[in-house]
Amino acid sequence: MKKEHVLHCQFSAWYPLFRGVTIKSVILPLPQNVKDYLLDDGTLVVSGRDDPPTHSQPDSDDEAEEIQWSDDENTATLTAPEFPEFATQVQEAINSLGGSVFPKLNWSAPRDAYWIAMNSSLKCKTLSDIFLLFKSSDFITRDFTQPFIHCTDDSPDPCIEYELVLRKWCELIPGAEFRCFVKENKLIGISQRDYTQYYDHISKQKEEICRCIQDFFKKHIQYKFLDEDFVFDIYRDSRGKVWLIDFNPFGEVTDSLLFTWEELISENNLNGDFSEVDAQEQDSPAFRCTNSEVTVQPSPYLSYRLPKDFVDLSTGEDAHKLIDFLKLKRNQQEDD
């Protein structure tokens, strides 16, 4: 895998080519000061709120106690930076997409941070929703700091123009998502995306699902992407229509799910024990899914559910983060 392969999988690199078969999206350049703010791990103070300042007296003991904390002469006042012009652009884009969006950077979405949102979802309606997810996500940090990890070429890292991608929010059923592996423009493997769960309909419809994905690949994807080796994700809706979700590099940086990268690169044993579709045709890809509830596994995102900020709290190293976090949660509840 080379750096150019990673660049070709940036959302803005492929979206214009496949706009007609994917979810409507808006791409906004990410200002440098916003990037700096997202990478600043000093506090959990989140920017992007439009609440006017208030000077009313506290109407509860909790608020009085809150003010007492801030009266401590040794306590620094923590305020979030504001980005009014960018905030306006983001809100206009969100409104144009129906009021709710799925956010991501050039490559990654903050899937590892869904648990921190009030609705335990990546559904965002405001810039502050997006910032909370992004600042809590290791995936987003890696996009910023290690975009070319596992690349084999030694050339200097290309300059990256970071972008905020806002995708129209759609309620996608995890059991209808599949990851497809392409080598030399040939579809060699299809894996259930949410492999930690057993879905009865996949086992019953596997041949039809495989056939639909093959037809979609041949009609819309094959020979049209910028590389010969790549990975793409699709969603098959209740009517059987297939939608393109994303592209990823063909290599270790991408999760191989129910395959191994050794199998995919060598193409050995692809139609082994896991295969559920007869490879009667030479071009038929291997299809793998979770076959029973016995093989169900914990979510791969569970390991991300204890940020260092909370570890700091348990050791008493940073109580200010807890205060900021609780304030944010209360404000979100008031908005709802």
UniProtKB/Swiss-Prot annotation:
Record flagged with keyword Chaperone: yes
Residues noted as binding ATP in the record, renumbered to the chain: 104, 107, 109, 111, 167-170, 177, 179, 193, 233, 246, 248
Residues the entry annotates as binding Mg(2+): 246, 248
Subunit architecture: Interacts with the eIF2 complex gamma subunit EIF2S3 (via C-terminus); the interaction is direct. Interacts with the eIF2 complex alpha subunit EIF2S1. Interacts with the eIF2 complex beta subunit EIF2S2.
Function: ATP-dependent protein-folding chaperone for the eIF2 complex. Binds to the gamma subunit of the eIF2 complex which allows the subunit to assemble with the alpha and beta subunits.
Compartments where found: Cytoplasm
GO CC, alphabetical: cytoplasm
Family of this protein: Belongs to the CDC123 family.
Protein's name according to its UniProt entry: Translation initiation factor eIF2 assembly protein
Methyltransferase recorded as keyword: no
Principal location: cytoplasm
Keywords assigned: ATP-binding, Chaperone, Cytoplasm, Magnesium, Metal-binding, Nucleotide-binding, Phosphoprotein
Classification via Pfam families: D123 (PF07065)
Modified-residue entries (Phosphoserine), positions: 60
Post-translational modification note: Phosphorylated.
Any one of the GO BP annotations: eukaryotic translation initiation factor 2 complex assembly
Domain of life (superkingdom): Eukaryota
UniProt GO MF annotations: ATP binding; magnesium ion binding; protein folding chaperone
